[in-house]
Amino acid sequence: MEAFAIAKFQRHGSRKVGLVLDQIRGKNVKKAEEMLPFIEKRTAELVYKTVHSAAANLEVKSGKKLDLSKVYIKEAYANIGPMSNLRRIQPGPQGRAMPYKKSMCHLTVVVSDEKGGR
């Protein structure tokens, strides 16, 4: 059985979230939740909350309490979110405008109680 959690419109870059996701992909949920507080990235807290939510969704879906050491992270990925509303302009030299963009991402975590997957 599978369950998933999606965190949309998060104010982190998808590449930076991907660095944390690479470290937990394929591991069991208990081990991932123990590892994440010690990863020194700002995005680790976001990933922790999403993994915890996906595991809770699986418990609700199955209708019974699950052992988190037997629940595995099947898929974990971050997609690029919209950038249209987070464009800003900074004054540049000689009266020019220098635009910069603040990035967003959508984070998806899929957990399964069967070992294997991708």
UniProtKB/Swiss-Prot annotation:
Keyword rRNA-binding: yes
Keywords: Ribonucleoprotein, Ribosomal protein, RNA-binding, rRNA-binding
GO cellular component, one term: cytosolic large ribosomal subunit
Pfam families tied to this protein: Ribosomal_L22
UniProt keyword annotation of Ribosomal protein present: yes
UniProt xrefs under InterPro entries: Ribosomal_uL22 (IPR001063), Ribosomal_uL22_bac/chlpt-type (IPR005727), Ribosomal_uL22_bac/org-type (IPR047867), Ribosomal_uL22_sf (IPR036394)
Molecular-function annotations in GO: rRNA binding; structural constituent of ribosome
Record GO biological process: translation
Subunit comment: Part of the 50S ribosomal subunit.
Free-text function comment from the UniProt entry: This protein binds specifically to 23S rRNA; its binding is stimulated by other ribosomal proteins, e.g. L4, L17, and L20. It is important during the early stages of 50S assembly. It makes multiple contacts with different domains of the 23S rRNA in the assembled 50S subunit and ribosome. The globular domain of the protein is located near the polypeptide exit tunnel on the outside of the subunit, while an extended beta-hairpin is found that lines the wall of the exit tunnel in the center of the 70S ribosome.
Protein family per UniProt: Belongs to the universal ribosomal protein uL22 family.
Record-given protein name: Large ribosomal subunit protein uL22
Organism, as annotated: Elusimicrobium minutum (strain Pei191)
